[in-house]
């Protein structure tokens, strides 16, 4: 049986561009991204508005109920398909007795420890304007860490998910936009020693970012892989 459950957005409420990204190897909602089975669970009412733009208390209550049901079914850990669920991290983790890891932002303190106090961690997010102090604090990110947040919401192709959700992505354009945000971030902030990709649709681009910038890049897959090893769902030896 599937040992890790991924709480995902409701079908019919996912922007067309993100549905394209779901087909890529490495995407959080593509089962082929993992060397172990995962259980994808739709959360009714989960969408751009209720997760990113206006985090919903009702949605949180529904997620808690689903988490409890999954725990009873024997699932050993629960994650989510959007890094902005970080704002629900404490409530979800407190609601069940199995590990809950809502967002790749949980890796920022780890990355900061790796690069040392004189360097910074860059965070590439779907929307910098929506990523609040509450999201960061929920993941253990303190004032002393000073992560450098780089948003994609002003990139014309990417912004379709907010402004024109029924429009498809030009995949070449959106790929270049993602890479450019990473390039420009490191150019403007040469102190960046590692990057964390908040958005769970960005892991398919992580290899390109690593190759171009030659720094560690953490994403949803590095997080779920870490937990899978901790639970012996996968083994290195």
Regions inferred by a protein language model and the residue ranges of each:
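N-terminal active-site wall of soluble small-molecule enzyme domains
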Residues: 57-66, 84-91, 95
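Glycine-rich, highly charged phosphate/nucleotide-binding loops
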Residues: 52-69, 173-182
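N-terminal glycine-rich anion-binding loop in soluble enzyme alpha/beta folds
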Residues: 1-58, 127-169
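Charge-patterned, long linear interaction tracts outside catalytic cores
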Residues: 173-207
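Gly/Ser/Thr-rich loops at beta-strand to alpha-helix junctions
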Residues: 10-13, 77-88, 104-107, 126-130, ...
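Non-catalytic positions within long, well-ordered alpha-helices that form the structural scaffold/packing
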Residues: 71-74, 112, 186-188
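C-terminal functional extensions of proteins
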Residues: 198, 202, 218-237
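Short, acidic/small-residue loops that bind anionic groups at enzyme active sites
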Residues: 91-115, 210-228
């Amino acid at each position: 049986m599937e040992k890790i459950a991924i709480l995902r957005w409701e079908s019919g409420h996912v922007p067309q561009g993100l549905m394209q990204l779901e087909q890529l190897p490495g995407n959080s909602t593509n089962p082929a991204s993992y060397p172990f089975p995962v259980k994808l669970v739709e959360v009714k009412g989960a969408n751009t508005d209720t997760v990113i733009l206006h985090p919903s208390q009702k949605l949180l209550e529904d997620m808690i109920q689903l988490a409890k049901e999954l725990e009873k079914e024997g699932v050993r850990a629960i994650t989510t398909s959007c890094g902005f669920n970080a704002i629900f991290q404490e409530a979800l983790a407190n609601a069940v007795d199995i590990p809950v890891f809502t967002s790749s932002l949980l890796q920022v303190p780890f990355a900061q420890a790796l690069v040392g106090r004189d360097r910074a961690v860059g965070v590439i997010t779907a929307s910098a304007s929506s990523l609040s102090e509450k999201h960061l604090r929920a993941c253990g990110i303190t004032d002393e860490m000073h992560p450098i947040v780089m948003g994609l919401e002003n990139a014309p192709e990417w912004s379709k998910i907010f402004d024109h959700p029924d429009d498809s992505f030009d995949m070449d354009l959106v790929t270049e936009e993602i890479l450019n945000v990473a390039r420009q971030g490191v150019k403007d902030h040469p102190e960046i020693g590692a990057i964390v990709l908040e958005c769970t649709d960005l892991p398919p681009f992580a290899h390109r970012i690593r190759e171009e910038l030659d720094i560690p890049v953490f994403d949803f897959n590095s997080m779920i892989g870490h937990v899978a090893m901790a639970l012996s769902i996968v083994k290195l030896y």
